[in-house]
Amino acid sequence: MSQKDRLGTGGRINRAIPLTFTFNGRTYQGFQGDTLASALLANGVHFVARSFKYHRPRGIVTADVAEPNAVVQLETGPYTVPNARATEIELYQGLVATSVNAEPSLENDKYAINQKLSRFMPAGFYYKTFMWPRNMWPKYEEKIREAAGLGKAPEVLDADRYDKCYAHCDVLVVGGGPSGLAAAHAAATAGARVILVDDQRELGGSLLSCRAEIDAKPAQQWVEKIEAELRKLPDVTILSRSTAFGYQDHNLVTVTQRLTDHQPVSMRKGTRELLWKIRAKRVILATGAHERPIVFGNNDLPGVMLAGAVSTYIHRFGVLPGRNAVVFTNNDRAYQTALDLKACGAKVTVVDSRASSNGALPAAAKRQGVTVMSGAVVTAASGKWRVSSVDVASYSNGKTGGKMQSLPCDLVAMSGGFSPVLHLFAQSGGKACWNDEKACFLPGKPVQAEASVGAAAGEFGLARALRLALDAGAEAAKAAGYTAAQRPVAPQVAETVEGALQPLWLVGSREAAPRGPKQFVDFQNDVAAADILLAAREGFESVEHVKRYTAMGFGTDQGKLGNINGMAILAQALGKTIPETGTTTFRPNYTPVSFGTFAGRETGDFLDPIRKTAVHEWHVEHGAMFEDVGNWKRPWYFPKNGEDLHAAVKRECLAVRNSVGILDASTLGKIDIQGPDAVKLLNWMYTNPWNKLEVGKCRYGLMLDENGMVFDDGVTVRLADQHFMMTTTTGGAARVLTWLERWLQTEWPDMKVRLASVTDHWATFAVVGPKSRKVVQKVCQDIDFGNEAFPFMSYRNGTVAGAKARVMRISFSGELAYEVNVPANAGRAVWEALMAAGAEFDITPYGTETMHVLRAEKGYIIVGQDTDGSITPFDLGMGGVVAKSKDFLGKRSLSRSDTSKEGRKQFVGLLTDDEQFVLPEGAQIIAKDTQVSATDPTPMLGHVTSSYYSPILKRSIALAVVKGGLNKMGESVVIPLANGRRITAKISSPVFYDTEGVRQHVE
């Protein structure tokens, strides 16, 4: 297998260990020490990806975490990793990777047609293009979602294991480059406990990618010496292959350490990734800097790379990315890349936007025979699958002149300056400050116990960076309580004279940007200079708004390469300075972190307990589909013979209305209330009076918060003179108990009353329907179930199927119903006895969905669905349960001007003109003659709170809250839908079925 672009010697790879890998179905070879990116380049593979929006051919741009293009799907099945950067993937035997965002293949991507449609797809096109006709939006959405995204999410469970650990140290150094090593060495030799974090497999940082000398020896020897000394010290921990991705308060830094990603899948054992939470007395950020690309025409072609990345591939991996190179720069650093290429036998031409430079590197390049074109810029690159030539024009005083010539080439190495990596500094609370001389943002005053060193602090010269890093390390150790007897001696590094950088944010004029070839700022998201200029013309002035409008800085690289260029172009368009324009927010995570890292080993059910009723297993055995209600697993519906939700609910509803059904209501909250002041407490908590409630009777109550808004509801039964049992909503049980305890403990500590949650003590079954009395009579002989002996809203003690029971005659469906409460350990036996007793009536177990339909047919509310914390009892039309002669919590708030004003949203029913159309819950309601505007706010009357199809009524029904709704009975309103359709409905009473309430009193 030929690696045609692999140099014969050099690089930090092990040529004795060849490795075979597969990319897009083709087999290639690399060496141990390669990354996937370097191995692909060694094999002459430059076209590796398609861009996000236009699906343009893309190649490898960088050699580090900032890579925007070479994003791949790594491995398959349980080990697959989407959106992995090829520049960070260490090569291993048998590695399998595929390009993302290309269908069916990279070369024959069907979405490549977007390149021809690009003029119709500028920034924000999706806000403008798919607005009409509105009923086509579902079709648009389907296609947009099909085209969106990069990699594919895993479809099977992750096979790897993840762990967490915690550490404390005196000094945490982030970055294992020259400055990080120097700072860690100074702190460690002073006796401080040091943790050094670096994201590479080996320490050295930028020194691995250049020919620098330290102490008159190759810089790598100095790296090896310092690393060896650090590893000998007992209080030093070195975390390689580790990324510090978050900096929180009080010097808490989160780090993910990759332990097995560099190994073949078949050989991985133990933990894949380890999440470190490190608390440090002092933090030193030696995070380096990102080289900036230059914004010129077709700068996204494969073969257009950063100059520093080219040097990295040469020195670190022994790869020559091109043999006929154009180095395009505005600074001296790129001349080192020109020298590196020349030393490898490549033909090199430097295009320098500056008129001249008196630096040492340009002089050295000229001595080596490198052609230098000063006062010139690359205006555009050409090529199909790889760059083949560039156009060069003159450049002077910030203006691009006429075309000078075309240069054939197979590589463009660009360098537009350097941007310190400020992400962690900004996350710590620090603010970045613009430096005109260095044309970059630098860290400002530290907010936490932190210092930035090296390129992260804008110190791009090696000699000065090392000296300052040693000082920072010693100062950090001293601040942590350690003072070295002798500071490490600063190594000797030859000072290099550098010419001044000349900022170059955009080649060509802003006016010409929309007309020429695309000049990309953000490679991954296809954000061109013209998009930013368009956003500015359309009124977007905040850089945060421009980011969201254009998608600049989105994606896996989060703007590491392009954001500074984009901010500068925006600043020019707005006539502002870059500091005035500002930066976008540096949010964690610095690089993508796997979900597994955060989850650790806790990949199963949450610690929050799953609550199951006493008959849960019966439900499972009989095929129930479940939904989560609070912490409870409740049967949602019981499908038979392949029924879907709608068919099952229709059958269950009709069974209850025409015969008998049974519901497991054990999840309802139950609070046992006992004591001489029990009635007093209930009077305070509920809006209605409780003094005269007889033993053996039940009463419905509404509970309000201090603002007079409905907080919870339920039925409370009086078991004895000083003994009550309160029921609450399933999801509100804990909240209500806490509410009661809060008032008892803080405001009424002298009340003689005790509360106990007994929800789990009782199994509760609602036997519902016109045949329900006949069912319960068969299993309970010691209770007279006649209407006179056992009236509605009453309670009786008895024995049901051999178990002591509390039976209540209450109904949440409007049908004759009995609620049977038995000790939980007898629950299944009693349930099965009830099922057997009801067999002759075809008794039907039903779930929460049917319960919702039945109660909606009767207009009964569900707190939290038909209320939202802004609804009073009067809004619900339930003023009848609000006492006028007693006080209760929230009463005073009911008389406030806002809660008693006209035009509040009130609880009503809705009947659609199209009887078969079920309104979406949450849909907004507008007046019939109101037109929806795409630009102006539309006045809303209210919204739909509950909506179902009623099998007994054979039509749709809905509950809603509408402004002044109780005075608008019979009026028509409109519900506009997302697809543009307008549904007309009439406001009605919320009681749709059995409006006289006779069915719950059936003989």
Language model: regions and residue ranges:
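Short beta-strand segments
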Residues: 26-28, 276-278, 403-407, 712, ...
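Conserved, structured C-terminal
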Residues: 612, 616, 620-621, 634, ...
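A short, contiguous, amphipathic alpha-helix enriched in charged residues
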Residues: 38-48, 676-693, 774, 778-783
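Acidic, proline/glycine-enriched N-terminal capping motif
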Residues: 565, 573-704, 709
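Residues forming the flavin
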Residues: 2-610, 761
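Residues forming anionic-ligand binding surfaces in small-molecule and nucleic-acid pockets
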Residues: 197, 289, 540, 650-666, ...
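Well-ordered mid-protein domain cores that form the structural environment of catalytic cofactors
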Residues: 692-743
